[in-house]
């Protein structure tokens, strides 16, 4: 009963990823036709399945290349509006910022996960997710190594292309760097990997939903990242000052920026004027307050509807509003899903349907303001802004410093976001796909594994 419940729940449309499901469907055919040949040698069957799976990933790899090519043509001439075959097959597909060596990634993951050797369990959602993750890491590190090997003898456009490499890595907090509701401690395996990334000259950012404004908020983020910041402050830390100060924290999706400061031995709050994107600076405070007030009232309605008055608390901040369980209580998973979907629908209404409002100043034409609603696992939040803006803000802020012209500009193909929430609705990492390459993990353990691959590929 439990197993069936989980399967049916996981197949809810808003929790699917169409690209992964489509690839999984392609792999189902060779599995059904060839994986259960009881009259053949097991090794031969495995090799046959591997060859067929490899061919599928090679074909998908070619479709990705074609999609990138047509996207580039469309950017040069928007009137063309050419649609790739892959987008026809998977309409919800986003934009690829790098090619994906899916076939090679499959071989590596097949060696680890023995996908081709399975006779009764077909290639799964998680198998495909991990293959896509590995392919993205391979693509980014291939660019990195090509850059290092082609410093001389290149000019013009080719030089610009060769100078592209991974420069910025951002992370979600809960479930990505540390377990849900926990924090980084000095013994965390993630800490040494983050320190290694900083030592390689990469910028490391934490883009989290947790929002604590002003310098007083630095203490809250220190509590979350204690193990890492304590290491940076320790006598045995070998990082140079500029490498330490390549650590940034973006709070409340895209609302509060902090940067490690070596003199303060901690995080320094960065004033909005130094990093807000132009479109964000133009957002009307009245519009933001209207959105927050409307969603606050909607959460009160939902809380009353589910009889959660005694077991939950609604919190309203400057740029976010959420509902959290009281100590010793919890909100059922189905209730969390209902609330986040209801909030998303409410947002869609007030962001697009100005005719529903009697007062034109309330209608606001608020479609220029970005807002996201997400399920945090035990709570539901609605934030002004989103992680696409958070990542883009980091890309632009870093390049305000004239001393780092050698790494600027930082493009989307030179940025990587690692997170656990990539469902199309109710997940706040999903929007990061608009501003960076992404890796979809399910636990801090997977984060450690993917960072080990990343570091090995860079140094290998």
Curated annotation (Swiss-Prot):
Its EC number is 3.1.3.99. IMP binds at residues 172, 174, 180, 208, 379, 387. ATP binds at residue 112. It is an enzyme of class 3 (hydrolase). The active site is at 172 (nucleophile), 174 (proton donor). It catalyses: IMP + H2O = inosine + phosphate. Keywords: ATP-binding, Hydrolase, Magnesium, Metal-binding, Nucleotide metabolism, Nucleotide-binding. Transmembrane segments: none annotated. Mg(2+) binds at residues 172, 174, 420. GO terms for biological process: inosine salvage; nicotinamide riboside biosynthetic process; nicotinic acid riboside biosynthetic process; nucleotide metabolic process. The keyword Electron transport does not apply. IMP-specific 5'-nucleotidase involved in IMP (inositol monophosphate) degradation. Homotetramer. Belongs to the ISN1 family. This is IMP-specific 5'-nucleotidase 1. The gene is ISN1.
């Amino acid at each position: 009963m439990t197993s069936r419940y989980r399967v049916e729940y996981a197949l809810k449309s808003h929790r699917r990823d169409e690209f992964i499901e489509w690839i999984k469907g392609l792999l189902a055919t060779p599995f059904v036709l060839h994986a259960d040949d009881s009259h053949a040698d097991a090794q031969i069957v495995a090799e046959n399945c591997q060859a067929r799976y490899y061919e599928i990933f090679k074909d998908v790899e070619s479709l990705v290349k074609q999609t990138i090519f047509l996207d580039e043509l469309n950017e040069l001439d928007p009137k063309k509006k050419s649609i790739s075959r892959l987008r026809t097959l998977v309409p919800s597909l986003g934009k690829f910022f790098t090619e994906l060596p899916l076939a090679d990634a499959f071989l590596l993951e097949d060696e680890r996960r023995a996908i081709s050797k399975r006779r009764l369990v077909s290639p799964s959602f998680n198998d495909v997710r991990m293959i896509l993750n590995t392919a993205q890491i391979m693509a980014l590190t291939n660019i990195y190594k090509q850059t290092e090997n082609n410093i001389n003898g290149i000019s013009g456009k080719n030089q610009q292309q060769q100078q592209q490499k991974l420069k910025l890595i951002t992370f979600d907090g809960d479930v990505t760097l540390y377990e849900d509701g926990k924090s980084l401690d000095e013994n965390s395996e993630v800490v040494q990997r983050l320190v290694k990334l900083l030592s390689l000259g990469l910028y490391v950012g934490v883009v989290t939903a947790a929002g604590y404004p002003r310098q007083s908020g630095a203490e809250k983020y220190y509590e979350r990242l204690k193990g890492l910041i304590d290491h940076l402050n320790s006598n045995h830390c070998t990082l140079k000052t500029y490498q330490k100060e390549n650590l940034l924290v973006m709070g409340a999706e895209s609302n509060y920026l902090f940067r490690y400061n070596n003199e303060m031995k901690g995080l320094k709050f960065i004033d909005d004027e130094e990093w807000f994107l132009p479109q964000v600076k133009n957002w009307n405070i009245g519009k933001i307050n209207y959105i927050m007030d409307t969603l606050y009232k909607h959460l009160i309605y939902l809380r009353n509807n589910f009889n959660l008055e005694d077991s939950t608390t609604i919190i309203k901040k400057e740029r976010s509003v959420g509902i959290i369980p009281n100590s010793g209580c919890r909100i059922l998973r189905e209730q969390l899903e209902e609330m986040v979907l209801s909030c998303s629908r409410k947002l869609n209404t007030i962001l697009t349907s100005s005719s529903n409002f009697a007062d034109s100043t309330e209608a606001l034409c608020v479609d220029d303001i970005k807002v996201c609603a997400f399920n945090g696992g035990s709570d539901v939040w609605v934030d002004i802004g989103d992680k696409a803006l958070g990542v883009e803000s980091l890309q632009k802020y870093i390049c305000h410093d004239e001393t780092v012209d050698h790494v600027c500009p930082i493009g989307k193909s030179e940025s990587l976001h690692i997170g656990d929430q990539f469902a199309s609705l109710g997940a706040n990492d999903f929007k990061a796909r608009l501003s960076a390459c992404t890796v979809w993990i399910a636990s801090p353990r997977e984060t450690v594994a993917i960072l080990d691959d990343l570091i090995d590929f860079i140094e290998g």
